Amino acid sequence: MKLLVQRVNEAKVDINGITKSKINDGFLVLLGIHKEDNESDIDYCIRKLINLRIFSDEDDKLNLSIKDLNYEILLVSQFTLYASTRKGNRPSFDKCAKGEFAKNLYDNFIKKLKLENVPFQTGEFGADMKVSLTNDGPVTIIIDSRSE
């Protein structure tokens, strides 16, 4: 499982011209699911995500987490995070989880994130979404359960 985490001042997801979700300060998280991911990958990624200290404290050190500040998360499924560009110029999606398997893991990720009492919103799995954001920093971090 791979998370691309961007620290944002605001982010939103539009579907068919209608805003589905919008946050202010927090994380825009793009979630990629590998074809071999399981529940332990979800647990690892959520633990890292909510405790990731990439917000500045009073000494301007990156020392505070989203949980410390009660900031929000906007979670968006992004199967292309596991695209491979090793051969040729067209990406291969062989490592990406497919269909119902990916949807089940995405739904389980959401269920487990709810248990952490961190405010969050989501995009819509499988939808054609327009995602917009204002980066803060910018600060962008990749959390990858396959390289723990």
Swiss-Prot record:
Pfam family, one: Tyr_Deacylase
E.C. designation(s): 3.1.1.96
CDD domains: Dtyr_deacylase
Record localization: Cytoplasm
Main location: cytoplasm
Reaction equation(s) it catalyzes: glycyl-tRNA(Ala) + H2O = tRNA(Ala) + glycine + H(+); a D-aminoacyl-tRNA + H2O = a tRNA + a D-alpha-amino acid + H(+)
Gene Ontology process terms (BP): D-amino acid catabolic process
Renumbered ranges of motif Gly-cisPro motif, important for rejection of L-amino acids: 137-138
The entry's keywords: Cytoplasm, Hydrolase, RNA-binding, tRNA-binding
GO cellular-component term (any): cytoplasm
GO molecular function, one term: D-tyrosyl-tRNA(Tyr) deacylase activity
Known role: An aminoacyl-tRNA editing enzyme that deacylates mischarged D-aminoacyl-tRNAs. Also deacylates mischarged glycyl-tRNA(Ala), protecting cells against glycine mischarging by AlaRS. Acts via tRNA-based rather than protein-based catalysis; rejects L-amino acids rather than detecting D-amino acids in the active site. By recycling D-aminoacyl-tRNA to D-amino acids and free tRNA molecules, this enzyme counteracts the toxicity associated with the formation of D-aminoacyl-tRNA entities in vivo and helps enforce protein L-homochirality.
Matches recorded under NCBIfam families: D-aminoacyl-tRNA deacylase
Family that this chain belongs to: Belongs to the DTD family.
Complexes and interactors: Homodimer.
Family annotation (PANTHER family): D-AMINOACYL-TRNA DEACYLASE 1, D-TYROSYL-TRNA TYR DEACYLASE
Domain writeup: A Gly-cisPro motif from one monomer fits into the active site of the other monomer to allow specific chiral rejection of L-amino acids.
Entry-linked HAMAP family: Deacylase_Dtd
Name listed for the protein in its UniProt record: D-aminoacyl-tRNA deacylase
Organism of derivation: Finegoldia magna (strain ATCC 29328 / DSM 20472 / WAL 2508) (Peptostreptococcus magnus)
UniProt lineage: Bacteria, Bacillati, Bacillota, Tissierellia, Tissierellales
